[in-house]
């Protein structure tokens, strides 16, 4: 029930289709800041986890939303985040640390993710991202609504995947970073066009990773 209320509240207050939404923790009373920050994370399919939570420190975020697309650039103190449990399975969440690295914790162990590397994260599962000093990240969340009925199939990732910026993934990472830096200056038409490009790139990258995982599994059984 609380999850449903949070999603409804974040949709009604934090997300306004195609408009730029700035967030600063100082706009809220101290007692309301943790819940307000939860709404920011929920907008891109995340929630606080573990012992590192957001309490009453300073946090900012820039957010923009289109049909089935949510992009947020956020800055806050040390904390851990994980997947927000949702009934529907959408495309993997794309997360990229900026200014400082982070630690990915999953069933495969712990892995340091350097600045500029991409992480594709399943919408569920036993994983978390730890920002040990400061949280500086760009997060892209895409739902099936953004596919506009295209029968391309939704790729399935069982585990988080870390991708170094090279070739196609570098193109995606650069567009993600450039878009996050200019969220407040794009017109609605420009934002809608760029958002659809991000959807297409994420879909292609996720399919490539899912296919490589499938091929590796098939080879292992031969």
Which residues make up each language-model segment?
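Residues in well-ordered beta-strands of folded domains
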Residues: 70-72, 95, 130, 141
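Alpha-helical bundle regulatory/interaction domains
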Residues: 2-55, 103-222
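Short histidine-centered beta-strand/loop micro-motifs
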Residues: 81-88, 129-131
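Glycine- and acidic-residue-biased ligand/ion/polar-headgroup-sensing regions
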Residues: 66-67, 75-80, 88-104
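A short glycine-rich, His/Asp/Glu-containing loop-to-beta-strand
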Residues: 37, 56-78
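His/acidic/aromatic-lined binding-pocket segments of jelly-roll/cupin-type domains
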Residues: 62-63, 84-87, 91-96, 111, ...
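Sequence-level motif detector for i,i+2 pairs with an aromatic at +2
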Residues: 66-71, 89, 135, 201
């Amino acid at each position: 029930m609380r999850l449903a209320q949070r999603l409804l509240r974040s949709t009604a207050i934090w997300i306004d289709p195609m408009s730029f939404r700035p967030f600063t923790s100082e706009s809220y009373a101290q007692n309301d800041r943790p819940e307000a920050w939860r709404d920011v994370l929920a907008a891109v399919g995340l929630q606080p986890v573990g012992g590192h939570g957001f309490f009453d420190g300073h946090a900012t975020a820039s957010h923009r939303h289109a049909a089935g697309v949510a992009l947020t650039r956020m800055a806050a103190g040390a904390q851990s985040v994980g997947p927000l449990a949702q009934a529907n399975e959408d495309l993997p969440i794309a997360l990229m640390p900026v200014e400082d690295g982070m630690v990915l914790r999953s069933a495969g162990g712990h892995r340091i993710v350097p600045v500029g590397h991409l992480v594709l994260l399943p919408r569920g599962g036993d994983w978390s991202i730890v920002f040990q000093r400061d949280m500086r990240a760009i997060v892209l969340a895409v739902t099936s609504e953004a596919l506009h009925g295209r029968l391309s199939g939704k790729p399935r990732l069982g585990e988080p995947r870390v991708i170094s910026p090279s070739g196609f993934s570098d193109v995606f990472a650069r567009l993600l970073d450039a878009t996050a830096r200019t969220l407040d200056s794009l017109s609605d038409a420009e934002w809608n066009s760029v958002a659809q490009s991000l959807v297409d790139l994420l879909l292609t990258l996720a399919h490539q990773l899912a296919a490589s995982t499938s091929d590796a599994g098939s080879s292992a059984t031969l």
